[in-house]
């Protein structure tokens, strides 16, 4: 998934902006698509946004006022950050690549809990507050 995200050649997510796109194209080829131009503002591949939130940064709604945080760093990224404005408040996650691995910053809104699952296998449930792991 990270290779596809970082790929500047077709098919790859960076191919589109590298070739002038500011939206998601229906066809990987954009204006050079066989049979003529397809939609240049299409949601067909928009699921990458869910992947950025739910996998790369690991934010998932687990139920009423409960979240699962399970980030999966990778690729050549030095950091990633995402937040979700729930009806209970903002939950946010940031990870940074360090010399020794990764550092995680997590913020859980009031009256909520989060099950944190890190790639190294560490698991813990946390309440509202700010955490560095």
Set out the residue ranges of the language-model regions.
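Non-catalytic C-terminal accessory modules of carbohydrate-active enzymes
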Residues: 2-133
